[in-house]
Amino acid sequence: MNIKTEVRPADAEGIARAAELLRQGELVALPTETVYGIAADARNGEAVSKIFVAKGRPQDNPLIVHVTGPEMLHGLVSEVPERAQLLMAAFCPGPLTIIMPRGPEVAAECCAGLDTVGIRMPSHPVARAVIEASGCAFAAPSANLSGKPSPTNAQDVFTDMDGRLPLILDGGECDWGVESTVVSVVGEKPTLFRPGHITLEDLERALGEEVDVSKAILEKLPEGAVVRSPGMKYKHYAPKADVTLLDGTFEQFKAYVDAHAAERPSCLCFTGEAEKLGVPCVEYGREGDGADQARHIFRSLRALDEQGDAVVYARCPQKDGLSMAVYNRLIRAAAFRVIEL
């Protein structure tokens, strides 16, 4: 691909240009409150297909459709279940994707052969302004090469997407740092497919019932299994280095790193730990603070690439609350290499 890529401020002129490109069936990278995304008109199958080419994304990985509010759902979904209405009232606009029965107007390319579609209502003013200016619901995955860490600023988008799409809107750093929570309301019970800033506990409170948790959140998806949500693929969010997640105390972590000094490893650790380890380190947030970890995890994984690291040992976060989202991204970055110390 050899497309001239322009980076523009996310001001009125930039938003107008983005809207024009979307209406023409082109791609635009833009900020959301979670991570930067690559947008295409969700009703234009040819435009949506360009996302898969730009990212090198497998065709069996469905896309999320972004709208400003429930009034845009006509034709995109065939029904809005009661559970979806409860979740939209509680969390939208915001970092939540709700899987609903697919409608006739959404491009088949968005859905990977499924009879469902993920719908999100972003709260970021730039994303909302582009939807309103273009009149398009847009399909948008994260704006990175497939399998790499998601970008949280325009420079990281440019690193991956230069020459692959015509426009990147620079809206500064993203607020949350990990992708949206994905929950399905199709079937007998609601099911969490991807953790994010809206936690399992948040969902259960809003719905007043237990939410099932997909095994794919914390385990490798079996070969040939149907991918029902973005973020379920085997290896994802990964830097170039071989990452191994070490689950234990700091003392156990340090002892393991010291014992493997011959590998010349680097470490992905919590705030304040780097100076105690004696090897190159990147810190990804305060221990026990899921929000801080989520805000920095993808930028930290990209920093490992910038250092040229080959072997990385990573501190393991908690596996509940908001930290579940961080753990979910890290085990995929590590291709499920986890050592219990």
State where each predicted segment sits:
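Active-site-adjacent structural elements in enzyme catalytic cores
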Residues: M1-L341
